[in-house]
Amino acid sequence: MTNHEQDQQDNSELLDDDQVTLESQQAADSGAEAPASDDVAALQAEIARLNEELQTTKENALRAAAEAQNARRRAEQDVEKAHKFGLEKFVGDILPVADNLERAIDAAKAEGADLGVVVEGVELTLKTLVDGLKRHKVEQIDPQGEPFDPQLHQAMTMIEQPDVEPNTVINVFQRGYTLHGRLVRPAMVVVSKA
């Protein structure tokens, strides 16, 4: 064999070795690509699932926010109605008092009016008013003859009364009122001195 033939054979063997190495590397690369493409597909599927989950969560959050806003709006409307119409029953109970006072004025203006009848009508009107107030938990404070209570009474003056216990209410200028037990207006009274 000549050198030239020997070189060709060596080159041919080298080419064969390179080709085998290249083929094995390509095979290895294609094997690596297959699992990589499976991983990519799995990751893309996971991304799609997470995007769908995110969209659902966003929709649920928007729905919850809308429901909360609607509930807040309904509550505000209920409070507004309560403020507007909360006194409706009270007004209904007080209107007969206004009607009776108008009748009493008309009766007092009539010629030859019996003052006793007018007084009786006004007393009945006052009773109607007090009863209407009681239905709404407004109670009168009429402390005549009771011990003075600075929580419920306001002393206008003090007078010496030897026959009355000291610090006793001897006269009521103006009755007081409570609403559900809470003082609205104290009774204005005269108290006996000690």
Curated annotation (Swiss-Prot):
Region Disordered, residue ranges: 1-39
Report the principal subcellular site: cytoplasm
Protein's job: Participates actively in the response to hyperosmotic and heat shock by preventing the aggregation of stress-denatured proteins, in association with DnaK and GrpE. It is the nucleotide exchange factor for DnaK and may function as a thermosensor. Unfolded proteins bind initially to DnaJ; upon interaction with the DnaJ-bound protein, DnaK hydrolyzes its bound ATP, resulting in the formation of a stable complex. GrpE releases ADP from DnaK; ATP binding to DnaK triggers the release of the substrate protein, thus completing the reaction cycle.
Q: What organism does the UniProt record list as the source?
A: Saccharophagus degradans (strain 2-40 / ATCC 43961 / DSM 17024)
- What subunit structure does UniProt give? Homodimer.
Gene it is expressed from = grpE
Entry's Gene Ontology molecular function annotations: adenyl-nucleotide exchange factor activity; protein homodimerization activity; protein-folding chaperone binding; unfolded protein binding
Per the record, the GO terms for biological process are:
protein folding
- Compositional bias (Acidic residues): 8-20
Q: Which InterPro entries does the protein's record reference?
A: GrpE, GrpE_coiled_coil, GrpE_head
Q: Which cellular component, as a GO term, is one annotated location?
A: cytosol
Task: Please state what the protein is called.
Answer: Protein GrpE
> What family does the entry list?
Belongs to the GrpE family.
Keywords assigned = Chaperone, Cytoplasm, Stress response
